[in-house]
């Protein structure tokens, strides 16, 4: 399970700076749900060999009068759901009453907490950080988030105990190695068989009260009741194995399966972290949207995280029964307008309460999973790449035409196509999008995003003395030397 790291501290201690550095511009802000999360931000990060979800808890303004009355409810929830808490302090400002109040709350929650003294650049760090030991939360880690000094070591130091306890294997930190991976035909076939033999992990997600519990009950059968919100279970989703028409599934339920009577009595508890962790751990995501409410910003935020995670996607527009035809037409128009960027995903109009259209969901779920794990040979990918060049040549870069050499599979779920060539890193985004769409159409990929990665061809003269003559220059030099010698003899 991917760990969750919460950044906690009073305002202006550098939480947002650290958040931006951890998530990087390409991962950036994943979800910021108005009205639900208030000042919480969520991002995906990969650093020091670990993948994790990082949460910026925002405006925690603790005072000596009592942290419980000053901390926002959402920030408290972030601390409760986190696996590791990084308590940021300001080494320049020193220890404050707000720091003491926050520390008291963290001690009472018995969370795995690491004190981080930020802004240590340009000062006597050891002297400035000495007073933070009085917080009683263990060692004080020094860092300068704005400059990036100490960030990687701090993440490794804080996540290593959790990773060891959970059996998480540390990965080699380096995107290039992952991008350069090339499957042999035997490896590709073995990987596809392995994926096809595994149960499909299906995460059912959506904002509160869109019918996730009702849909899960409908899929599992009315008689199936799973207890939810027992002590100790609020942080993690429920994993429910099931079988349908000979195919095994594992439903990752983020809402909890309640008795039908209680679905209408209790406002569904929404946990952003629980949802994001379920997406990370799934193969296919089923996003449930309320037809009566249309596409909300929260839905788009969840879609953004699904796309960033590279997960296969099926969309269910729930509560479709009983809606006036004019409203249905308006909803379909809105779907075309706002969801045009995910035209690869199947959209189903269902009624979880009455079961209308629910059975057809699994056709699209299996189709999406099969597309995400399908084996495609190097020769096929190279042929498609060549056809895309024939139809639309790559642009000129510095007066030279970008040359694409070959393509191969770089991974599954999502499908990754690695294209090798000269100057490929300089290809404009418009041409990369053209190639991605060309591969999608040619491979008939449905229900899953497809990723293209580009690798520069090796330079055979790299590392050689730049003054060394070429073969033709060497021949010319010999002719000139011979000519001079003959002339001198005369």
Swiss-Prot record:
In what residue span(s) does the EngA-type G domain sit?
3-166, 200-373
Q: PROSITE patterns, per this entry?
A: G_ENGA (PS51712)
Tell me which Gene3D superfamilies the record gives: 3.30.300.20, P-loop containing nucleotide triphosphate hydrolases
Provide any one GO MF term from the record.
GTP binding
> Which parts of the sequence bind GTP 1?
9-16, 56-60, 118-121
Q: Where is this region: Disordered?
A: 470-490
Q: What is this protein called?
A: GTPase Der
Name the species this protein comes from.
Shewanella pealeana (strain ATCC 700345 / ANG-SQ1)
């Amino acid at each position: 399970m991917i760990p969750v790291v919460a950044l906690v501290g009073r305002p202006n201690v550098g939480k947002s700076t650290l958040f931006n550095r951890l998530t990087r511009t390409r991962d950036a802000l994943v979800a910021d749900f108005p009205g639900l999360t208030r000042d919480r931000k969520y991002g995906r990060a990969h650093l020091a060999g670990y993948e994790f979800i990082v949460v910026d808890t925002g405006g925690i303004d603790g005072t000596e009068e009592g942290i419980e009355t000053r901390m926002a409810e959402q920030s408290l929830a972030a601390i409760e759901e986190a696996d590791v808490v990084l308590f940021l302090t300001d080494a320049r400002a020193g220890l404050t009453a707000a720091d003491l109040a926050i520390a008291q709350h963290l001690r009472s929650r018995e969370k795995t907490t690491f004190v981080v003294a930020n802004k240590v650049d340009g000062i006597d760090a050891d002297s400035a950080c000495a007073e933070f030991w009085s917080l009683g939360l263990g060692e004080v880690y020094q860092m300068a988030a704005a400059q990036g000094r100490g960030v990687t070591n701090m993440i490794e130091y804080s996540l290593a105990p959790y990773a060891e306890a959970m059996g998480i294997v540390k990965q080699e930190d380096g995107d290039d190695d992952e991008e350069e991976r090339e499957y042999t035909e035997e490896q590709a076939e073995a990987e596809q068989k392995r994926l096809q033999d595994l149960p499909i992990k299906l995460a059912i997600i959506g904002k509160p009260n869109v019918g996730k519990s009702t849909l899960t009950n409908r899929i599992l059968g009315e008689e199936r009741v799973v207890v939810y919100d027992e002590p100790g279970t609020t942080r993690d989703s429920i994993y429910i194995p099931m079988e349908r028409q000979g195919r095994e599934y594992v439903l990752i339920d983020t809402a909890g399966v309640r008795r039908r009577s209680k679905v209408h009595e209790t406002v569904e508890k929404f946990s952003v972290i629980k949802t994001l962790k379920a997406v990370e751990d799934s193969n296919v995501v089923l996003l449930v949207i309320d037809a009566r409410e249309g596409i909300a910003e929260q839905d788009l935020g969840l879609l953004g995280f699904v796309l960033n995670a590279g997960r296969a996607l099926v969309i269910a527009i729930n509560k479709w029964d009983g809606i006036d035809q004019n409203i249905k037409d308006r909803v379909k128009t809105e779907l075309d307008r706002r969801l045009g960027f995910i035209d690869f995903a199947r959209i189903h109009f269902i009624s979880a309460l009455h079961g209308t259209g629910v059975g057809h969901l699994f056709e699209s779920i299996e189709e999406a999973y099969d597309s995400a794990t399908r084996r495609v040979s190097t020769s096929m990918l190279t042929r498609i790449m060549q056809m895309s060049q024939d139809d639309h040549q790559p642009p000129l870069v510095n007066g030279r035409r970008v040359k694409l050499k070959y393509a191969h599979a770089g991974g599954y779920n999502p499908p990754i196509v690695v294209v090798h060539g000269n100057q490929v890193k300089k290809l404009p985004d418009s041409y990369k999008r053209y190639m991605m769409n060309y591969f999608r159409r040619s491979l008939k990929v449905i229900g899953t995003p497809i990723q293209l990665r580009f690798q520069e061809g090796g330079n055979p003269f790299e590392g050689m003395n730049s003054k060394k003559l070429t073969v033709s220059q060497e021949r010319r030099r010999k002719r000139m030397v011979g000519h001079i010698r003959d002339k001198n003899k005369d």
